[in-house]
Amino acid sequence: MASEVRIKLLLECTECKRRNYATEKNKRNTPNKLELRKYCPWCRKHTVHREVKI
């Protein structure tokens, strides 16, 4: 059976290390680690969130 193209992942805040968001990505289109600037409710500001596997 073929491997799935879309993988599920968590986005972790780079400042407080809390995992705030769950999302998925297409690993063919974005092979590198995903980095998004999202709001962290624990830090109460927008911070960079990096991809972490579930």
UniProtKB/Swiss-Prot annotation:
SUPFAM superfamilies: Zn-binding ribosomal proteins. GO terms for molecular function: rRNA binding; structural constituent of ribosome; tRNA binding. It comes from the Bacteria. GO terms for cellular component: cytoplasm; ribonucleoprotein complex; ribosome. Found on the solvent side of the large subunit. Belongs to the bacterial ribosomal protein bL33 family. NCBIfam families: PRK00504.1 (NF001764), PRK00595.1 (NF001860), rpmG_bact (TIGR01023). This is Large ribosomal subunit protein bL33. The gene is rpmG.
